[in-house]
């Protein structure tokens, strides 16, 4: 592996007294996914500058190659020669455990015939709901077969486009999938989002991506209606992937929990990633956090206090911020986060259980998680990473402040979004032991 770690491993997190140093934020997972797909939908060559190297990115690249794109890593960039509006028919695609990749590709699969989606992660991605997207594609005229709205799924076009509704109650990814498809349809797309929209920020990232590739799209202020003219073409070119706020939030929380000073660069101030709000939440909790342009510095060790926040806009930072809540005075509540139950694991119930295992008090409702802070965590036990990269980040941060080492199972799943997470923390002064395992 490029990180120099075992293929599969548990990690033993040792407590540390301080963290200090400067890191460049890893490339955004969300933007890498969007830019690579858009590049494949363009005819011609696109350079995606500073693309992520996560398992999700690699899963997408494999699928795009199967569909006929020529994709090459050149240093830190990815060069894509796309298939335009004509991905290969009759292919079987395996998006690994990448939910956004699977959904975006399912939308585009309406340009093909007999594209089948499978996964090796039957207990994770295989259980995640796809029915709302599949129903919208059927309403557009696609032929769809699935296992009760879950993978495996087979899709066939063609579709012409027009007006269609899609539920945004469970995920905004369904709408994004249709938005990537829309410009290539003869009649375009008049997309109506129904239900309470979850995660506005990713929808704005998709609109931003379409604009970067020369496409026209109009959206109402509340994003309930998105209109995309048909007969357009994705324009190849050069796009720069911004820094990743969800992963960087974990670094900044770690910095806040321990004495020292940590700076993370490459965090664009006006970025559309919703997890940018994590910086404001951390500051509201009492962290000494200062921004200078794209540089964010945290001077750690200050006492933190509890907050109550609607977490819908920064769901991918909730686990990292939960580590801050675990040591904050009072009870922190993340509200309106029901979508966390539909991730790689149930990030509400599974988080509560892991916090209780560590001696903390946590409670949950259908759409909220509350954490009562403590002065200390004993450590000296094994926590379950639940095969979830965000859970692994949370548990790692807790382990850095524990009184004795904390073992986390299945820590190799960190590679889904942040392959260098442990290595970056080591650069700041953390100490880990990597324990090879045969477990999946």
From Swiss-Prot:
> For binding 3-phosphoshikimate, which residues are annotated in this chain's numbering?
29, 34, 171-173, 199, 316, 343
Q: Which reaction is recorded as catalysed by this protein?
A: 3-phosphoshikimate + phosphoenolpyruvate = 5-O-(1-carboxyvinyl)-3-phosphoshikimate + phosphate
Where in the cell does this protein reside?
Answer: Cytoplasm
Tell me which InterPro entries the record gives: Enolpyruvate_Tfrase_dom (IPR001986), Enolpyruvate_Tfrase_sf (IPR036968), EPSP_synthase (IPR006264), EPSP_synthase_CS (IPR023193), RNA3'P_cycl/enolpyr_Trfase_a/b (IPR013792)
- GO cellular component assignments: cytoplasm
Alphabetically, the GO molecular function entries are: 3-phosphoshikimate 1-carboxyvinyltransferase activity
Q: Which residues form the signal peptide?
A: none
Instruction: Provide the alphabetized UniProt keywords.
Output: Amino-acid biosynthesis, Aromatic amino acid biosynthesis, Cytoplasm, Transferase
Pathway given in the UniProt record: Metabolic intermediate biosynthesis; chorismate biosynthesis; chorismate from D-erythrose 4-phosphate and phosphoenolpyruvate: step 6/7
UniProt-recorded name of the protein = 3-phosphoshikimate 1-carboxyvinyltransferase
Say which species the protein is native to.
Deinococcus geothermalis (strain DSM 11300 / CIP 105573 / AG-3a)
Q: What is the lineage of its organism?
A: Bacteria, Thermotogati, Deinococcota, Deinococci, Deinococcales
The record's gene field reads aroA
